[in-house]
């Protein structure tokens, strides 16, 4: 289940995608649950848009697309039917006016809405209006205004707004370029203010805001670099 400000979505056990909203994004939705498509493996939401991936790697979208980030040709007003906007996509993420897609070959692309004054052809495919960010990417998290990527070699990269050191790059300065902050990572989890990495050796590392003891290090001081969080017993197997 995914919950947005004005639209919600669920993928059922049979891989069918259903949405409900209060702004008329879906066909005759009007707050009622409506089936959109079959064979869906992932869905991502913004305030007014729905983007999803099918089992065959096709990327589809519907919504208002006020800024052009999701790549449907009608970039204003209601969009009554989902439109194919890409293919060979493994993972998608939406952050405000930006849509990110990881392709099957590990390439990470970003398409930004016109609020950023990027120039692209509204009639072009999603990928032709996007820019390549990184290679060898297996996972990405985009909580609010910063970005965290896990690459296939286990390295973790961050960029964006650096409130309370949530980038983990050793400073409190914002960064508009991806920077490596830790290696040997197995899994990454992020919130709006702090981040966590589970390493291959089972150790847990965290960084960022710690006003309420979120990091679990026994203090309430933020950390601008990843720090190991020690607990009694054996290592961790996974995290959410």
Where are these regions (language model features)?
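Surface loop/turn motifs at the tips and blade-to-blade linkers of beta-strand repeat domains
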Residues: 34-38, 83-86, 131-135, 179-182
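Short glycine/serine- and acidic-residue-enriched loop/turn motifs that recur at repeat junctions
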Residues: 18-34, 60-80, 109-131, 160-177, ...
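Short coil/turn segments at the loop-to-beta-strand junctions that recur within blades
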Residues: 39-43, 76-77, 87-91, 136-139, ...
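Acidic surface patches and DE-rich sequence motifs
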Residues: 12, 28, 46, 54, ...
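Conserved core positions of repeat-based scaffolds
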Residues: 7-10, 19, 49-52, 61, ...
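A detector of tandem-repeat and repeat-rich interaction/domain scaffolds
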Residues: 155-157, 179-180, 186-190, 198, ...
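Short coil/turn segments that connect the beta-strands within blades of beta-propeller domains
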Residues: 5-6, 15, 47-48, 57, ...
């Amino acid at each position: 289940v995914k919950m947005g400000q004005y639209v919600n979505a669920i993928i059922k056990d049979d891989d069918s995608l259903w949405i409900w909203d209060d702004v008329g994004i879906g066909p005759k939705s009007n707050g009622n649950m409506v089936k959109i498509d079959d064979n869906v493996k992932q869905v991502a939401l913004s305030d007014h848009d729905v983007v999803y991936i099918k089992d065959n790697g096709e990327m589809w979208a519907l919504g208002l697309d006020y800024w052009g980030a999701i790549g449907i040709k009608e970039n204003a007003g209601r969009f009554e039917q989902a439109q194919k906007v890409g293919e060979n996509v493994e993972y998608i993420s939406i952050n405000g006016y930006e849509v990110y897609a990881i392709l099957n070959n590990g390439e990470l692309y970003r398409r930004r809405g016109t609020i950023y004054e990027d120039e692209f052809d509204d009639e072009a495919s999603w990928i032709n209006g996007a820019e390549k960010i990184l290679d060898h990417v297996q996972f990405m998290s985009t909580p609010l205004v910063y970005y965290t990527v896990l690459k296939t070699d286990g390295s973790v990269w961050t960029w964006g707004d650096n409130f309370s050191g949530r980038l983990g790059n050793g400073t409190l300065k914002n960064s508009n370029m991806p920077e490596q902050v830790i290696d040997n990572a197995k899994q990454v989890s992020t919130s709006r203010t702090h981040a966590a990495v589970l390493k291959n050796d089972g150790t847990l590392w965290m960084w960022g805001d710690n006003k309420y003891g979120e990091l679990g290090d026994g203090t309430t001081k933020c950390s601008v670099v990843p720090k190991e969080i020690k607990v009694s017993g054996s290592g961790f197997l996974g995290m959410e």
